[in-house]
Amino acid sequence: MSLRGPMKRSHLRQVSAASLDSLSTSRSLEASHHDAPSDHPSTPDERAIRLSFPGLERRQCTLWVHDETFSREEILFNQTAFSDTGVSAGDVVEILHARHTADGAHSLKADLGSKSLRDSHAKSSSTLHLDALSKFKTPLQSRCLFVVKPLPQDIKTRHPKLELSVTTSIANIFGFKNRDTVYVSIVDRAQCSASHVDIAFRDQYVVRSDMWRLVMSELADKIVYKGQKIVFMGSIKATVKNIFIRGEKVLSGYFSPQTIPVFRSESAKYVLFIQMSREMWDFDSEGTGDILFSRVINGFLPELFKRWANSDARHLVTIVLFTRVEYDASTIGMSSTLSPESLKNIFNSNHAPTRDFYRVVVNDMASGHWTTILDELKKDFRTFLRDVSTLKVDDAPVAKANGSASAPNARPAVIAGRPSTALRGNILEAIHLASSHLAYDHIDRDMVHTGTSIIVITPGSGVFEVSYESLASTTEALTNRGIAIDLVCLSPMPLHSVPLFKYREPPRRPSTSSFGDIQHGGYSPEMRHSFASLANRTPHLSPKSAIQDSFPGIGLRDSWSTRPQEWNYGIPHWLDISYWNPDTYREARRILKNDPNAPIPFTVTKRSKIFVPRVRMYEIQMMGVMESEQSNISIPYLLEGQSLSRGPSPGLSLSPASLAAPGKPSSRRSSNFRHQLSDSLRPEPFLQNMENPKDVILAKSKKTPNSVLSWMDKYDEKVFQPFPKQRQRRRSPKQKRPSEPNVQVSGAHDRISARSISHLRQHETSGPRPAVRKVEPSFPTPKSPSSAKSASPKKPALKTKSTTKVPRISRTISFALRGLSSTPPRAVASTEVNVEHATGKSSTDTFPDSKSVDSLSVSDSASTRTVIEVSKPPGTPQKPVQSSAITPSRPISIRPAPKLPEEPEQPNRSLAASFSTTATEIPLTEDTRSAAQLRKRGPKFEVTMDPGSRDGQIKSPQSKALAPWVRSINPCNTPREVLRDTTWFGRWQHAYPRPPHVAVVKWKSLKSPAILPLTTEEFPTATELATEYLQTPYRVFPNDDTEGVEAPKTRGVLLREMISLRLSHGFQIVVGKNVVEVSGQYSLQSPNVFDTKGLERDGATVFLSKGKSIHRLICVEGAEIEVTRFTHRSSSVLSPERTNGCTVYTAAMRTILNPVYEIKEIKLDSTTEEYNWNYADNYVAGHRDYLYNPAQQLQFWRVRYVLIPMHLRRNIQSFNEDNEEEIHLLGIDHLTHIWQRHKYVPPEEKRFDTSNKKREQNPLNIMYQTRNPSEVVAAELDRILLTDPGLDSSPAQLLPESELLERSSISLSSLAQIIQGDNGVRMMDRRWHWRLHYNCFIGFELTTWLLQNFRDIDTREEAVEFGDQLMKHGLFQHVEKRHNFRDGNYFYQISSEYRVARPESRNSWFPQIRTEKSTPSTPAGDHSKESPVVGHARSDSVDDTPVQTPTTPSKSKNKATIMLSKSMKYDVDPRKRSNRPEVVDLHYDRLHNPDNCFHLELSWMNTTAKLIEDTVLSWASTAEKFGLKLVQVPIAEACAIDQTQPFRKPYRVQLKVPPPKAPAPTFFNPVSFAQQGAPDQHYFQKALLRKFDFVLDFEARSAFPADVEVSYSWGIPDYRYSQYIHRSGSLLAQITDEGDILLLANRLVSTRSAASRDIPRHERMDRPDQYRARAATYDPGDRMSPRLSPVARPVHDMASPLSPQGHPPLDSANLYRAPEHILSGIVEFCSDAEKLEQFYDESLARPASTKVGPAPATLMDSSIPSLELPASVVSHHISPPPILPSRGPQGSTTVPSVDLRSQVRDDSALPRGSPRAGPRASPLSSGLRPLRLG
């Protein structure tokens, strides 16, 4: 059970008070958030509810319970029994159990149907929530609803007393029992309409367009109930999980037009990011004492996995550890693996040199293996910190100062970095990386899992400091791809709004300043941070003078803009935050386990929690109990609403001139103050004991004008008076507060007591506070030599008379003491001072430069700096201001300060701080002291008069661009109503039935992520749409002349298809008030998006939105649809400038099997490729002539499959005496017949095809060859017709209609003449493996010829029967005399008595050039005009990398073009379960080598994915009966995987011993068999792959001749290396140009195998020893279908044999490890020099083709078995030659042929007709050769 039980109830009680009130009360919060537009109100309060019906009163009746044998109807209702009530068909009736009447406060009466009484029941029964099992005990929640239907007449006749009956499943859900007494009454649809319905599904891929169709078909205007099973089109299955009415969970509800469906996937892909920041190794001092990582590994993750297991979820899990490491500048210069070049993108104004690290722990592992996942995580955690903190120094010679090079010196690795804090981590980059593969979501579509969820686990508190560019890029990417993030924080929740991103806007124009010196120099991060905030916070001060005078040697070439360096705060709508509290869930777990000592829920009064200060400052943590009790750490109020860029205001004003005088050089600080620094946080202010504390702060200079100093002294005396006087001032009325000067000279502050701040709050909270105030002095102020803006509230009372202050040592203080309420918190004692081991150095040095008054304090807290901005009127004398290095701790203000009037063109802001919880330990040097003072100019909030309001004023184009997705707020004073605003959640608004609570873990989202809702209310106003968007209109109309295309025929169907297409691409249907206003001219009301009829009327308007793009579809007259695209003008502002359209991100990545981190440059493209919607809409409408490759142009969904030949069991091999190859080909032939049978034919064409049924033939026309496609193309290049127009023609030549034959009137001799004539069957010399068969034909062609040329033969079966009779009469015979006549790739020869002498042999499978009909010059002499068949394969040649040229040069100098695959339209819905055509493009090979993979590719645009999955599942089941395994593989090659999936990379294996020179291959043709070719440079690598049971998948482009343009129906092949696949389908391999082997796990097959948990383990295959694999052979997906749906199970089990080591076949439990097991065997073999040497010798002594598949060996034609398909080795009519050339170690050894032939005959253990004899060369050989030499 979920832990939600006891915790949820308290959550429910918080929300249910309003929602269970009378329906006449104000609209509930939830309804106002999520319900539909104003014209269609979704709550009963806004509708006209029928309060009186003729039959509204409740009626008592007896309920029956029936099963499916009684009736399939869920509810049977006899209207005759209730005739007096006026109930009619279509009314909604509720069934209420009688027990509710006894529990309620009112007794049942005849008129209990009124809503007020019904709700009184709800309220009176609210106490039932106390029961742990009473979730649905109120009548509102537990009632059963149904729509009245007429009772079937037969049931009414047989059971006249039946009043009401429900099925057993309904009775179980609602607690009904047979013969129960229930009460029935009519209810209004408005009163029982559900606001949200949660729908869950698993083990299937469902696109959002299918969800929309499911709702329209199965849910709209119907009653839904919890646990209801939904079946759509007999294939898509889903379950109703929850139903909400006005925020309450109920058992049943009415699905109204305004109900929002929320789909959740229980088989999703989860990417878990664990931020390994510095805090992850911090100890939990207040809890168990463990480090925070223990909370992850022992708390959160086990809880998450248990909840997955309890809900039977089947997710795929990827876990990545990530962190950002900060380096010392001194380590960057050393020669290391992290060179300065690789650190080029990590310098910025706020950070030290950093590098981002990613460690992939597991990738796409099934969630059921959670123990393995945790073990891997623990293992990687042990070494993670060591790996990322050390730099390995290169062994390269180090250049000396004199230029000479020293000898190589191996230097050890050094610890050069440390992880950054969570605040400054690389969280946005990690999220962007995880979502980057979604840009290719349409390629290699996983048909089992739906949805991707990213969970980020951070030790922080939900505050992150990011760059604007990263925030904008990530926001755009997530918005475009429709994905949301779950953030789980391990630290306690702060008291401000979260999640929070703080960022600085980029400059309006490129800056050319020399600020890079600060960025790249030796300054500390804190100093650079302060530098960045200097100039913009002194707008009236010359930036040049300020920087140059304060820091000599640093100049600015150009002025900084005012805006860019100010902090802004935003909350993204795509981030859902949770806080993990182990104590809470530990208590909940005790309750669920019925612990007798656990407290009873809701019966124990909770003790008031004492505020515990979350302090990380070392000095405070080390204080004793008495010290901390006696200390008064007082908290002044936060400043808010103050603008730092306004003009002068009454009070202090200093001119820039007064701060520009140069000073003396500074000296070192004296050491005696260093010891006093740690005392700065103790109660006694030690500066009181100094003789003249002012001298510590202001060191006098001779050039300092006395007027300024004296004025400041007088001002200090007035402002910082002794404590009693100041306290008295605090008691003055609040109205005096605005008149006090808003200048905070923090150098003179001291502590105030808790009592004083309490008094302060009492007075300040009394009376209303004006929103706008004018600041004036409240006491006489001396004549100011300068003026300054008011920038801070009144200072708290001082505890002593000291006018100086010791600087605080804190580097970063979080002021997260403020909740979301506008009422100031009453905490008195402590603040959160989060500083890690902050140190300070005391000194009496003075700064030589004049500074602002603000610089008097060294308090540089990143959280609570107060800033003063100064300006100088003309004529003000200059006075250098000198500073001390030490001031006492200054209290923190957390009360909202009064807002000041803002000037025009200046934003209204308040001061804020960085929400840092920790900070880097940095020594205080001369420069850092200055930086610390300047850092006091704290960040500013993006605040308006309505904080957090979306409609608030936007201050810059950058903020405006981010505004819809990242809301700029004041995190410390965000009104509750703003957080409750449903528009806060953006595109995910409709996924929340109730406003989520931040403090709890969102288990629902973590267990089953919600898919992007179908609807949204995010929409601009009419004015914004007209002024801020660019419009692009066009019109679409259905194509009346589609010519066989499955195009819609009506406007309504076209509109639905266009909406479906947009939904599948991430668009949402817009509903709400704004849409009604905008579309007023076309429609008077918001359309019912689930009503198909309403969408078809003239003028119907539908708006869809996705990010910044909006589409409007209008049904106009003339059967047309007008489409208007709206594109936001600021889209270009949101995206930063990119290189080649994307951002290049450099990071150190370590994938699963990689031993070290490798630097990778990753292109992060946030913008999706511009989709041509005009083309797409017209393509849907049937206009398709203008697209040359629609699959790529319109981003079709694409998947690729391969049929892998498996080793067969003996009982299958003995079937009809067919050998393994023949059985495989039979399987492909069987599949082709299925494809032909379900080929899509438009309805109008079917009428014409019915009369021509006998004319149809198998259009696939696959040509089978025993050579790889590249070899066939190279051999036949001189005979290929350039355009190859005859490939699609029928191999049989039709006779004229008048010459058609009849079986009864034909003789054998005449038939023999016709068959061998010009209009007969093609006769040619055909080669199969190494034997050439002369003048033969194949059975498939003769079958087709007979079918088309005989009037009385109508089916292929009749043709086969007739052909068998001809064969029995001796017209022809099988070349091996083994088979009777068959329809397939079987070779037959005309008998000698009927054979006609032929002048030539037609032996090319390509259309022959008539001038070249002589003897073929290449070995492919067994080809015909038949079409080539390598359709979908990417690369099928393992053979020879160098291209083999034909014997005779080609006479054609033009580049030949050949198509190696063909496509067809395939109907995946032959049973017509869908209301539309369900068609896919099926691409298949036309040239196939039986020992290689047969390739298929499916592409579709708007087809139901579940139907495609079911279709492929049936193919897999059929193929496995014939020893073929259907496996999904990636479309791209293995070496390119990291371009689309950044967390994956092929594993490179190098041979420890370089292979020797490969032997030269020998080619054969009918004339010569001794022609030598170029040696294959990868001969031994291919043999090695064959040894480890790999077969060829796809050939590289370079394997084909350079003068041949090879293309496929799906596009041009682009493989760099040839690719091979393991027979298990779990591992891909490629051989690089250097001879290395790249290995990559095929996770597409593993996901499907893992889902087939219920498929039993299969017995191992019983094979003779000579068929055993030599190396470890794993078949983890043993006889499992490529889809993991258990619907269809294979009939036969074609498993790989056990390895010699005895490893059993892998089941689904360890399927994830299958690729690693195979890889480990290969690595071990390649690392063993002795085994490699032995392998090289054996390969040379036993020459065989290096193909993964059959290859021509060094044999004569006469010594090769004559096979129709691969057949037994038998004698041939051609005598063997005397000797056989063989490649020995030196390529010169010859072996007598008689010995070889004796080995060939040694096949007694094999079935007759085996294609190969003797032991296999390897498990991969798949019968590569008939002989085994040596």
Swiss-Prot record:
Q: Report the locations given in the UniProt record.
A: Vacuole membrane
Protein name listed in UniProt: Vacuolar membrane-associated protein iml1
Indicate, by first and last residue, each region the UniProt record lists as having compositional bias (Polar residues).
16-29, 668-679, 907-920
Q: Give me the stretches of Basic and acidic residues compositional bias.
A: 30-47
A GO BP term, please? positive regulation of autophagy
- Which Pfam family is one of this chain's hits? DEP
Q: Which GO terms describe its molecular function?
A: GTPase activator activity
Signal peptide (UniProt feature, chain positions): none
Q: Which domain of life is it from?
A: Eukaryota
Q: Which gene encodes it?
A: iml1
Instruction: Please give, as recorded in its UniProt entry, the membrane topology of this protein.
Output: Peripheral membrane protein
- Supply the source organism for this entry: Aspergillus terreus (strain NIH 2624 / FGSC A1156)
- One term under GO cellular component: vacuolar membrane
Main location group: membrane
